[in-house]
Each structure stands twice: as C-alpha cells, then as structure tokens.
C-alpha cells in the first residue's frame, strides 16, 4: 500500500482498532510488510492458512509447524510492540501442533479457523469451475462444527487468547464458541 493510503488508517484507528491481515510466501515478505505498516495498525494477523493460495503461500505454510514458527518468529523479532495474531488452518491432522509452534514463536493470539478445503464448484451453465483459481476455501454454516472442534482442542493446548471464527451466523452460534 502507498504511504498516503496507510495514513488514512490513522483516522479509522481513532474510532476502532485496525488489524492488518498479512499474506506472503516467506519470512522476508511477512516481515517486510509488517515493517512497512506497523505504524498504522493496532495488530497483525498472519494469514498462514488460506486453502486456495498458490503453492508456497497460505495453508502450505500453516500446515507445517516449522514454517509457521519461523514466520511468526521473524515477524515478532522485527515488530516488538504490535500484537501478532496467527490465523490457523483446520486442514491439518493436529491443529494443536501448529498452535503450539505459533505460541512458542511469540504469537500473542490465534484465530481459528480459516476456511476448509480447498473445494470445487462448477457453474452448471458453462460446465467450468466458478473460481478462476479452480479450487477455493469452503466457508459458511457447515464449517462451524469443525471450527468448534479446533477451538476446543487448541484451548486445552495453549495459553494465549483465541479468536473463534468460522460458520457463525447468529449470536447463538457465537455463544457456542465461548463455552
């Protein structure tokens, strides 16, 4: 983003916290983006969980505890005074392993979960995939049981705050994440 555009965030920050979601393919990219934007945000969410990212991005990172640890550690080493939230993928055998790696690297909180998948949708009129990327994340009410399972298991495994997301449509859905 351009410096002028980033400065506009300060007006927003007077009214509400701004959390920047960062996406990349290496420690350097995540750290560079964080360094360039740290003065304009209240927290960073490191998105290491997008299921439809091209190879080397998103869940390709978040499925690997070592890569997750290295990226979180790199950003945390460069950005000392801005909280780091790591958004986790549910598409792993043991989400607590990834959560612990992020916590050990210095994450201040975790977001659970990103979309599930990838999945595929076909446009019946054209007989072609709906997404240009062909595959994409599956979201909506049907992922809530998966999100709840991930939050439940992770809550028992780490000592940092959790943001439970995924499949929430009503206040009753949100309340389930609190229990």
Tell what function each PLM region has:
Residues 1, 51-66, 98-160:
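Glycine/Thr-rich beta-alpha phosphate-binding loop at enzyme active sites
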Residues 23-25, 49-51, 87-91, 113-117, ...:
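Active-site beta-loop-alpha junctions enriched in small/polar residues
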């Amino acid at each position: 983003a351009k410096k002028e555009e980033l400065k506009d965030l300060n007006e927003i920050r007077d009214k509400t916290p701004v959390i920047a979601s960062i996406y990349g393919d290496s420690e350097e990219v995540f750290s560079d983006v964080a360094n360039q934007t740290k003065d304009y945000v209240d927290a960073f969410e490191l998105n290491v969980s997008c299921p439809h990212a091209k190879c080397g991005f998103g869940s390709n990172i978040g499925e690997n505890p070592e890569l997750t640890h290295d990226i979180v550690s790199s950003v945390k080493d460069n950005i000392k005074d801005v909280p780091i939230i790591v958004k986790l993928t549910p598409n792993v055998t043991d989400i607590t392993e990834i959560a612990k790696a992020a916590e050990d690297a210095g994450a201040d909180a975790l977001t659970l979960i990103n979309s599930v998948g990838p999945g595929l949708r076909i446009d019946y009129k054209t007989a072609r995939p709906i997404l240009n990327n062909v595959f994409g994340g599956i979201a909506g009410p049907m992922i809530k049981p998966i999100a709840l399972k991930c939050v439940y298991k992770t809550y028992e495994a780490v000592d940092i705050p959790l943001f439970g997301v995924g499949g929430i449509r009503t206040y009753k859905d949100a309340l389930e994440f609190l229990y």
